[in-house]
Curated annotation (Swiss-Prot):
The reaction(s) this protein catalyses: hydrogen sulfide + 3 NADP(+) + 3 H2O = sulfite + 3 NADPH + 4 H(+)
Species, as recorded: Neisseria meningitidis serogroup C / serotype 2a (strain ATCC 700532 / DSM 15464 / FAM18)
UniProt binding sites for FAD: T327, Q361, R391, L392, Y393, S394, T409, V410, G411, G424, G425, A426, S427, Y604
Protein name as it appears in the record: Sulfite reductase [NADPH] flavoprotein alpha-component
Domain Flavodoxin-like residues, every copy: 66-204
Region of interest called Disordered, as start-end residue ranges on this chain: 212-231
Lineage: superkingdom: Bacteria
Gene name of the record: cysJ
Subunit structure: Alpha(8)-beta(8). The alpha component is a flavoprotein, the beta component is a hemoprotein.
One of the GO BP terms on file: sulfate assimilation
SUPFAM superfamilies: Ferredoxin reductase-like, C-terminal NADP-linked domain, Flavoproteins, Riboflavin synthase domain-like
Alphabetized GO MF terms: flavin adenine dinucleotide binding; FMN binding; sulfite reductase (NADPH) activity
Cofactor(s) this protein requires: FAD; FMN
Length: 604
């Protein structure tokens, strides 16, 4: 019988049901091969003819789900994303939750629904864990994202020029690559809780609508966890800090130094707080009482006047001392204050964003009041201020070495503005106003993106300038306490050897004991030609490349705006020169190190 005859004698086949078609569309080549054999055997004798069972079952219809990613520098974006994930799951929506440090950037092309919560660091750069994805989306190999629905929540600090820049960049680039917004982007300031909760509520409602359209079976309803502000094991946290005691405050720069750097030791006894090398300590502080008096005098406000702050009725002097930000100016403050001052010059400053940003960066709040006097009520003035926020300091000790203590390396911020002495809020509190045995409220902020290698035999290269050396003291303390076999190399820079060599005797002892195997120091002002850590990196190119071939992990800590960028440029030069790669290959190599967690940065 000819093929033509066979076609004519067989009755027409009915169309497959839609649900079967949907299942078949998800099969891979191996599954199709198995299924065709199985079907042929069943058609021939109603049995499988001894075909081996396929381990992979036919795929079920893909449930409605959403991927929630976070890119965090200090933990805020992570906590918001965790809370959003909990709310989505409580609404019956399946969630895939990941921090970007654990997410393969190329997987973005396979996502269908994506929520991203990201902070911004430095001069508008994405957090460290988001760098690889950011580069992919903005590079030549950026994937099409026309099947993606997304929403972005940006966290930032409006006192900086590039407010929420990372969130804006991701949001814009997703759209340019074809993705569709589930919600308009939200940019949240330091007091982000209300904005984040609003964004979460709207995205949950929107995704419930989308799930209904897809007729997906929702996941079981769950009860959202209570007390998200509290650590899971009940330890002290940002919202409930531990009242610790100051043990020591020692200046570790010379009297002639232009810098005032303090070694701070704090007692954690009784807190059950634990930290790892790479973590930060959050420090709550009180403003300078002299600054509070100065501001109230300038405004003509009685210190006993009562206002609402922190859910309480307090004298305005007490409220300004402990509840409001007084040392960091913001564009919002200047714009809000300008109508009260009724001054043409201040109005012009407030109206020009570029001029305003420069003014905010250079002019403290108190000096705005000096230059542009105004009369406000206590409530009006407080309404212009941001809530006081804790400061984070890299921990410079290992608990394996110091037990129930935690050590910090704090650069005291001091400057003059129009002849008036000014100081940083937290650094001034720690360096000048907190007395020995005095109480400081603290909490541990985890930094899982800045960790020693799990294999202690791996070599490490530590690159830092100024107080950026802090976590490396903790790293080497930890390696010494473990008697780790891995080699340690420190590249450190500061202005002067004799004045600014932080922890000099300790590094010498580590070298003597065999826990500091290589060291290079860049003293930028000790000779006519300035020498920086990036110069030492290029100088040691062959050695660095050799260590990388041995599996070394590279760590960078310090200033994001200048030092970290210069160091990265130097590392790329090393990879190009000693590694014999072109520029594109060097970039890809560095991205590979990032994804392998062998290139980690803690920059600010």
């Amino acid at each position: 019988m000819s093929e033509h005859d066979m076609q004519n004698t067989n009755p027409p086949l009915p169309p497959l049901p839609p649900e079967i078609t949907q299942l078949l569309s998800g099969l891979d080549a191996a599954q199709w091969a198995w299924l065709s054999g199985y079907a042929w055997a069943k058609a021939g004798n109603g049995a499988s003819a001894g075909l081996p069972a396929l381990q992979t079952a036919l795929p079920a219809a893909e449930p409605f789900s959403v991927t929630v990613l976070s890119a965090s520098q200090t933990g805020n974006a992570k906590s918001v994303a965790d809370k959003a994930s909990d709310s989505l799951e409580a609404a019956g929506i399946q969630v895939r939750r990941a921090e970007l440090k654990d997410y393969k950037a190329k997987n973005i092309a396979d996502e269908r629904r994506l929520l991203l919560v990201t902070s911004t660091q430095g001069e508008g750069e994405p957090p460290e864990e988001a760098v690889v994805l950011h580069k992919l989306l903005n590079g030549k190999k950026a994937p099409k994202l026309d099947k993606l629905q997304f929403a972005v929540l940006g966290l930032g600090d409006s006192s900086y020029p590039n407010f929420c820049r990372a969130g804006k960049d991701f949001d814009r680039r997703f759209e340019e690559l074809g993705a569709k917004r589930l919600l308009e982007r939200v940019d949240a300031d330091l007091d982000f809780a209300a904005a984040a909760d609003g964004w979460t509520g709207r995205i949950v409602a929107r995704l419930k609508e989308e799930a209904a359209k897809n007729r997906a079976t929702p996941a079981p309803q769950t009860t959202p966890p209570a007390g998200l502000q509290t650590a899971p094991d009940g330890r002290y946290c940002k919202a409930d800090p531990f009242p610790a005691a100051l043990l020591a405050n020692q200046k570790i720069t010379a009297r002639q130094s232009d810098k005032d750097v303090r070694h701070i030791e704090i007692d954690l006894s009784g807190s059950d707080l634990h930290y790892l090398p790479g973590d930060a300590l959050g420090v709550w502080f009180d403003n300078d009482p002299a600054l509070v008096r100065e501001i109230l005098d300038l405004l003509g406000i009685d210190p006993a006047t009562e206002i609402q702050a922190g859910g309480k009725t307090l004298p305005v002097a007490s409220a300004l001392l402990s509840h409001f930000e007084l040392t960091q100016n913001t564009p919002a403050f200047v714009k809000g204050y300008a109508p009260f001052a009724d001054d043409d010059e201040l109005d012009r400053i407030a109206a020009d964003n570029a001029v305003l940003q420069g003014f905010v960066q250079s002019t403290p709040i108190a000096d705005v009041l000096h230059r542009f006097p105004a009369k406000l009520t206590a409530e009006q003035f407080a309404g212009l201020l941001r809530p006081l926020a804790p400061r984070l300091y890299s921990i410079s000790s290992s608990q394996a070495e110091v037990g129930d203590e935690v050590h910090l390396t704090v650069g005291a911020v001091r400057f003059e503005h129009e002849g008036r002495a000014r100081a940083g809020g937290a650094s001034g509190f720690l360096a000048d106003r907190l007395e020995e045995d005095g109480t400081v409220r603290v909490f541990v902020e985890r930094n899982d993106g800045f960790r020693l290698p799990e294999d202690s035999r791996k070599p490490i290269v530590m690159i830092g300038s100024g107080t950026g050396v802090a976590p490396f003291r903790a790293f080497v303390q930890q390696r010494a306490a473990e008697n780790a076999e891995g080699k340690n190399w420190l590249i450190f820079g500061n202005p002067h050897f004799a004045r600014d060599f932080l922890y000099q005797t300790e590094w010498q002892q580590f070298a003597k004991d065999g826990f500091l195997h290589r060291y290079d120091f860049a003293w930028s002002r000790d000779q006519e030609e300035k020498i920086y850590v990036q110069d030492k990196i290029r100088e040691q190119a062959e050695g660095l490349w050799q260590w990388l071939q041995e599996g070394a992990h590279i760590y960078v800590c310090g200033d994001a705006a200048k030092m970290a960028k210069d160091v990265e440029a130097a590392l790329l030069d090393v990879i190009i020169g000693a590694g014999h790669l072109d520029e594109e290959g060097a970039e890809e190599y560095l991205d590979m190190l990032r994804e392998e967690k062998r290139y980690q940065r803690d920059v600010y």
